[in-house]
């Protein structure tokens, strides 16, 4: 693929003012979504996967507007002059967002047009009503009357029928109708329910031909069933995005009831963005704009498709050649070596599981075994996000019903999962689980399980520390780490952290575990300072980071100081990055890359040289639930877990981090001007995701791997010298 970049490059030292030290957070997020859209242009990816990337980018942009843009609009309306890290006021940020978002939307539509054209060449099409044959119309007639007509609500708009409330992300068909008996004009709306599929698949004899009809076209096709005696004079879609940020009353006597009330308010949030189809007649456009009352600068006229998130409905299973090859995650051989006994495997040695390349089933099995094991006396579990029919929740309920002491720390404020978490909390309570909701003013984002088991005359604790949610569905596509241990110090620390979450009892000490909001920031600062001292003393130094977001100004400034001292810093940041790398006099020793590929990068890893070249057994390695953002350091409960076991240490350092740094197939690099440039594949090309799919992990190999790593084994997974931070 040709290199993608912008022509700007920084050749002179940049002044170290705030606006030059930091990249704007919101614009960095839009740049991330642009990389997602660029993935849809990647000819290496199968066509339906490219369509999926467009759908994901649409969903991302919807959430961005409903949360981030909504917050800035609220600040601007309130007259707040709060400035971003790069010195912009809310109004200035909204102007820049508007400019970048419009360009992004144009790119989305252009790429969508290309992908749909290529899909048509492969036999998968969206067809217009005039392309339907008699058999198609007969099928759609029945489909409409049985599945669509009963749930549609046509709404006339006149003094007796006021303009209705349009739900968040609601797609509405606006109509201009002519009454046939007197030529009178009527305007009407038909909200298209989200519960109905937007793309209706037509029956075809072979999957080699797949045809879809859009719901809005189906409604127009049978409009006479809804408005008999009228003819259509004009129509078009519009879509409303509403403010979904919600403030919870932390001091309420009944926290759950308070949250339910707040969630009802969210459904009627202020309109933040209004997108109108370009073919919407002028008089209907004026009506919609006047009634919806979205900000004037957040009105978008779209000549292409509205509601790109719905494109995911076109991703069918019966055209496997248009999808990524099916991949079955490996189950760790280490567990199999012990007959599926998770506790025996963990007692033998710590184990880390690399999702989705290794199955999330091992996490489920760990908790199911705990639930059914008569020697297990207690289970403690955090829950931030999980699936509707979660096997994790099922295991906790089974354990409680069998008489075990079960505690679940359920975070009610996981954005867009609040209602689901309220439901599961009630289900857990009904089964006898002790449910707690954590801290007022703090979100519990740590991913932690603790199982206490009677073994002989003693009690032994087993812990699971994760970087991702206990969600078996997202675990199929998110890259995350699950660390299992029965180390006495770590499990004791886990128990202390649970006591902190349930009883507000701040631990007097922690043996190994670092946690937010108390010690993470301080420990990270000390680790960076140690690298600065090593560099100044002429000893090996270096920092490797793998994060979703790098935003915190204080930590970024600390990395700048490390760079100035000569510490080489390499960062793999999937999403937002406010740090400017490669700026002479500020960050010339810092490199930042991003991997956007088949799987969503989600694990958080931090590595510090600790006086040794990298990678080396002496390097300090941590995995974490926390990104480097102020909220993760100061306003959330998070874990920052040291890795000591040699095999686990080698897997995280020599295998995962090394290969991520080496990837040149799905990678982008960030320049000092804030521009992301696609990395050109080498010869041979290196894909981190393909490597992890085809190479067993070191920790999970069990009997296939005995003893410490040999130098040859380390060399086999060594990254290319171009990414070596200690050259």
UniProtKB/Swiss-Prot annotation:
Binding residues annotated for ATP, in chain numbering: 60, 478, 574, 602
GO cellular component: polyphosphate kinase complex
CDD domains to which the protein is assigned, alphabetical: PLDc_PaPPK1_C1_like
GO molecular function terms noted in the UniProt entry: ATP binding; metal ion binding; polyphosphate kinase activity
Cofactor(s) listed in the protein's UniProt record: Mg(2+)
Catalytic activity, reaction form: [phosphate](n) + ATP = [phosphate](n+1) + ADP
Protein name: Polyphosphate kinase
Organism, scientific name: Acidiphilium cryptum (strain JF-5)
């Amino acid at each position: 693929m040709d290199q993608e970049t912008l022509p700007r490059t920084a050749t002179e030292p940049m002044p170290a003012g705030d606006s030059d030290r930091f990249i704007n957070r919101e614009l960095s997020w839009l740049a991330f979504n642009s990389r997602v859209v660029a993935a849809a242009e990647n000819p290496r990816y199968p066509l339906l996967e490219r369509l999926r990337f467009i759908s994901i980018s649409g969903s991302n942009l919807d959430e961005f507007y409903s949360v981030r843009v909504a917050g800035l609009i609220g600040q601007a309306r309130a007259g707040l002059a709060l400035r971003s890290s790069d010195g912009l006021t809310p109004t200035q940020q909204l102007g820049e967002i508007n400019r970048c978002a419009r360009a992004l939307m144009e790119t989305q539509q252009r790429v969508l047009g290309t992908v749909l054209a290529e899909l048509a060449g492969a036999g998968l099409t969206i067809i217009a009503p005039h392309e339907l044959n008699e058999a198609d119309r007969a099928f759609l007639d029945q489909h409409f009357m049985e599945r669509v007509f009963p749930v549609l609500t046509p709404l006339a708009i006149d003094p007796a029928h006021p303009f209705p409330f349009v739900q968040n992300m609601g797609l509405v068909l606006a109509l201009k109708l002519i009454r046939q008996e007197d030529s009178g004009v009527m305007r009407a709306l038909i909200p298209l329910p989200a519960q109905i599929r937007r793309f209706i698949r037509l029956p075809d004899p072979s999957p080699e031909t797949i045809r879809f009809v859009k719901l809005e076209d189906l409604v127009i096709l049978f409009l006479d069933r809804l408005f008999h005696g009228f003819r259509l004079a004009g129509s078009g879609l519009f879509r409303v995005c509403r403010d979904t940020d919600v403030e919870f009353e932390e001091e309420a006597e009944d926290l759950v009831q308070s949250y339910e009330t707040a969630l009802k308010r969210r459904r009627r949030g202020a309109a933040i963005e209004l997108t109108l189809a370009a073919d919407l007649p002028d008089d209907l456009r004026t009506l919609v704009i006047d009634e919806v009352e979205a900000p004037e600068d957040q009105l978008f006229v779209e000549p292409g498709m509205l509601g790109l998130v719905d494109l995911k409905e076109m991703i069918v299973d019966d055209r496997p050649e248009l999808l990524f090859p099916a991949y079955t995650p490996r189950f760790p051989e280490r567990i199999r070596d012990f007959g599926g006994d998770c506790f025996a495997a963990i007692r033998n040695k710590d184990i880390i599981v690399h999702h989705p390349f290794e199955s999330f089933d091992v996490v489920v099995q760990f908790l199911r075994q705990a639930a059914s094991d008569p020697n297990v006396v207690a289970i403690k579990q955090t829950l931030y996000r999980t699936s509707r029919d979660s096997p994790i929740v099922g295991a906790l309920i089974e354990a409680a019903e069998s008489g075990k002491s079960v505690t679940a720390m359920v975070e009610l404020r996981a954005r867009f999962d609040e209602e689901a978490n309220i439901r599961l909390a009630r289900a857990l309570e009904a089964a006898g689980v002790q449910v707690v909701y954590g801290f007022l003013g703090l979100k519990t984002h740590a991913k932690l399980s603790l199982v206490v088991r009677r073994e002989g005359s003693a009690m032994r604790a087993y812990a699971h520390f994760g970087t991702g949610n206990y969600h078996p569905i997202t675990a199929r596509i998110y890259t995350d780490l699950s660390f299992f241990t029965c180390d006495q110090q770590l499990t004791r620390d886990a128990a202390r952290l649970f006591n902190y979450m349930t009883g507000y009892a701040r631990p007097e000490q922690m043996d190994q575990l670092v946690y937010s909001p108390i010690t993470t920031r301080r420990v990270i600062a000390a680790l960076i300072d140690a690298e600065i001292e090593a560099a100044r003393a002429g000893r090996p130094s270096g920092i490797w980071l793998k994060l979703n977001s790098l935003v915190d100004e204080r930590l970024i400034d600390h990395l700048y100081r490390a760079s100035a001292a000569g510490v080489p810093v390499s960062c793999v940041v999937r999403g937002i990055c406010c740090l400017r790398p490669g700026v002479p006099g500020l960050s010339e020793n810092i490199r930042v890359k991003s991997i956007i590929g088949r799987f969503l990068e989600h694990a958080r890893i931090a590595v510090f040289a600790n006086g040794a070249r990298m990678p080396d057994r002496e390097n300090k390695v941590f995995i974490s639930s926390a990104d480097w953002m102020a909220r993760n350091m100061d306003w959330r409960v998070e874990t920052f877990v040291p890795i000591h076991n040699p095999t686990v240490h080698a897997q995280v350092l020599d295998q995962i981090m090394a290969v991520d740094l080496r990837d040149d197939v799905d990678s982008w690099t960030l320049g000092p001007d804030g521009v992301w440039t696609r990395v050109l594949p080498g010869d041979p090309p290196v894909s981190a995701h393909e490597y992890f799919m085809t190479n067993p992990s070191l920790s999970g190999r069990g009997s296939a791997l005995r003893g410490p790593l040999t130098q040859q084994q380390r060399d086999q997974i060594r990254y290319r010298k171009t990414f070596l931070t200690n050259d």
